[in-house]
Curated annotation (Swiss-Prot):
It comes from Alkalihalophilus pseudofirmus (strain ATCC BAA-2126 / JCM 17055 / OF4). The lineage of its organism: Bacteria, Bacillati, Bacillota, Bacilli, Bacillales. GO terms for cellular component: plasma membrane. This is Na(+)/H(+) antiporter subunit B. One of its GO terms (molecular function) is antiporter activity. It is a multi-pass membrane protein. The keyword Signal does not apply. The gene is mrpB. Mnh complex is a Na(+)Li(+)/H(+) antiporter involved in Na(+) and/or Li(+) excretion and Na(+) resistance. Na(+)/H(+) antiport consumes a transmembrane electrical potential, and is thus inferred to be electrogenic. Does not transport K(+), Ca(2+) or Mg(2+). Keywords: Antiport, Cell membrane, Hydrogen ion transport, Ion transport, Membrane, Sodium, Sodium transport, Transmembrane, Transmembrane helix, Transport.
Length: 144
């Protein structure tokens, strides 16, 4: 990655705004994915692209300081969540990865569906973010 001048005000401002929009859309896709197109995979790709945009708009060192994640550990954590989510069905005699859902009344949101697919999607979300950023940042660090 190249070193940017400290007076790139337009680039930094647009990066912040566009990153916020991408992250908000990523969260929407993550939660809408149960019944509509989206879910953990595409939400993870959108989040990874937003973080990559931050790496491109600012210098890599300051972003690593602001976001101190080890993305390889994020991959492992996401895999553990996705794998262990499936064991819930086995505990009650159903097949692996059986999905359960229930509707609950939540004061502000009204009737809301809570499902066991959400933690599985969270695991996929973390795996996709971790893999995408590990690959991209490894390539970027080799070019430096």
């Amino acid at each position: 990655m190249k070193n940017l001048k400290s007076n790139d005000v337009l680039l930094h401002t647009l990066t912040r705004v566009v990153t916020f929009i991408i992250l908000a859309f990523s969260v929407y896709l993550f939660f809408a994915g149960h019944n509509n197109p989206g879910g953990g995979f595409i939400g993870g790709l959108m989040t990874a692209s937003a973080l990559l945009l931050m790496y491109l708009g600012f210098d890599m060192r300051s972003i690593k300081k602001a976001i101190p994640f080890d993305f390889t550990k994020m991959i492992a954590f996401g895999l553990l969540i996705a794998i262990f989510t499936g064991f819930g069905g086995l505990l009650v005699g159903d097949p692996y990865l059986t999905q359960y859902f229930e509707y609950y009344q939540i004061p502000i949101l009204g009737e809301t569906e809570l499902t066991t697919a959400l933690p599985f999607d969270l695991g996929i979300y973390l795996v996709v973010i971790g893999i995408a950023l590990t690959i991209i940042l490894t390539i970027a660090e080799d070019d430096m």
